[in-house]
Design a protein with these regions (language model features):
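Conserved S-adenosyl-L-methionine
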Residues: 184-195
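ATP-dependent adenylate-handling active sites, centered on carboxylate activation for C-N bond formation
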Residues: 1-182, 197-209
Length: 211
C-alpha cells in the first residue's frame, strides 16, 4: 500500500512503558516501509483508568477478553483524540485462516481444517466482535483485509496439509507467501509471533490481576 501511495501511510503501535516487547519491531517495519509511524506508550494508570470502559463496551468480565482488548481500546482512543483518521486497518482473522496456537498442534490436516472452520464460523462472537467494539467505541471504522469474503473462501480452499506447522513456525504458509518478495525484512517475516495482548507487555497481565 505504501508503495502505491504518494503520501506516507499512518501506522501506529502501542506498548507498556515497562516492557514494550513489539514496539522496536513495529518501528523497524515502519522505517523499512517508510510510513509515518506513531508509538503510543501506556502505563499501569492507563489500565486502571480504562478498565471499566473496556468492560462496559465489551459487556464481559472475562479476563482473557479484557486482556486482549485493553491495548486496542487505548490505541483507538488515542487515534480518535489526536488525528483526523476515521478508518483503520487491522490484522484480525489471519490466525483463524493460517493457524496459531490452537492449530499448530493439530494431529493431522483434517483436524486443522475442522478447527479453522469452527473458529471462522465463531469469529463474530470473539476476536472480530472485540475489535469492532474497541474501534467503534471511538467513532472509528475498522477494515479487516484478511476477512475479505473472497480471500477467506480462497484461503479455506487451500489444502490444509500446506498449513500444518511442520517448520516450527506459526502461520508458515502466510510467511512463505512473502518469502521471495521484499515487502518485509526477512528477520521480521520469520520472527516468533506474539499475540497482540502479549506484545504490548507481559506486565499488563500482572497489573490486571491486581485489580
Amino acid at each position: 500500500g505504501q508503495r502505491l501511495s504518494n503520501q506516507p501511510i499512518r501506522t501506529f503501535a502501542i506498548g507498556m512503558e515497562s516492557d514494550p516487547i513489539d514496539l522496536k519491531y513495529a518501528k523497524q517495519v515502519a522505517d523499512y516501509l517508510g510510513t509515518e509511524h506513531t508509538e503510543v506508550i501506556m502505563n499501569k494508570e492507563d489500565l486502571y483508568q480504562h478498565l471499566k470502559e473496556v468492560i462496559y463496551h465489551l459487556e464481559t468480565f472475562d479476563i482473557t477478553t479484557i486482556r486482549a482488548s485493553m491495548a486496542m481500546y487505548i490505541l483507538c482512543k488515542y487515534i480518535h483524540q489526536n488525528t483526523d483518521i476515521k478508518v483503520i486497518m487491522t490484522g484480525e482473522v489471519s490466525d483463524e485462516l493460517f493457524g496459531y496456537k490452537y492449530t499448530d498442534f493439530a494431529p493431522n490436516p483434517k483436524a486443522f481444517q475442522e478447527e479453522a472452520s469452527k473458529r471462522i464460523k465463531e469469529l463474530y462472537m470473539y476476536d472480530v466482535l472485540r475489535a469492532d467494539r474497541c474501534i467503534s467505541a471511538h467513532a472509528l471504522e475498522g477494515r479487516v483485509p484478511f476477512a475479505d469474503v473472497d480471500f477467506v473462501d480462497y484461503s479455506m480452499s487451500i489444502d490444509p496439509a500446506k498449513k500444518m506447522n511442520v517448520y516450527n513456525k506459526g502461520k508458515y504458509l502466510l510467511r512463505h507467501a512473502f518469502e521471495e518478495t521484499d515487502y518485509l525484512p526477512h528477520d521480521i517475516l520469520f520472527r516468533e509471533k506474539a499475540a497482540f495482548s502479549d506484545a504490548v507487555g507481559h506486565s499488563m497481565v500482572d497489573y490486571l490481576k491486581d485489580l
